[in-house]
């Protein structure tokens, strides 16, 4: 029987609520999410604008404390660490590519979305097919050939 590989990053019952004075009340950005990432695994966070992608990544990377739930990185509960302990753990384990620089400028939107699949050894044809399907699902399939410099921030 094979031994199960442990997660390098794990989030359990993750919630994040932004306070708001708007008529609708507070904004729930994350609602009970569970995430597990194993060493060497490539993961893409995909969703429409305003769906909580950036909030999730900030919570997973220790840049923001979740309203509830916990995040473990390299076996340590990050949600309980503060100050220097948290800084040292982040320096050893996690890096960020912020939204402004996360697309490869010489590749089309389609090829950028297909990249994580190619790293998982998915054939180029299948990776492009799946990437186009995802872009269509998000309502931006018509922008598949666009270079990052021609896309808006929400695309």
Name these PLM-found stretches.
Residues 1-2:
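A short, compositionally biased domain-edge/stem linker segment
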Residues 5-155:
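ABC family nucleotide-binding domain
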């Amino acid at each position: 029987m094979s031994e199960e590989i442990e997660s390098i990053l794990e989030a359990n019952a993750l919630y994040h609520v932004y306070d708001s004075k708007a008529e609708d009340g507070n904004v729930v950005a994350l609602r009970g999410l569970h995430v597990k990432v194993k060493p060497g695994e490539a993961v893409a966070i995909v969703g429409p604008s305003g769906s909580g992608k950036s909030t999730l990544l900030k919570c997973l990377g220790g840049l923001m404390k979740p309203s509830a739930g916990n995040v473990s990185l390299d076996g340590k509960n990050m949600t309980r660490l503060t100050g220097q302990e948290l800084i040292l753990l982040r320096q050893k384990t996690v890096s960020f590519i912020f939204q402004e620089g996360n697309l490869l400028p010489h590749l089309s939107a389609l090829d950028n979305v297909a990249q994580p699949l190619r790293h998982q050894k998915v054939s180029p044809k299948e990776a492009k097919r799946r990437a186009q399907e995802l872009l269509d699902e998000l309502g931006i399939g018509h922008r598949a050939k666009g270079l990052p410099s021609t896309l808006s921030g929400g695309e």
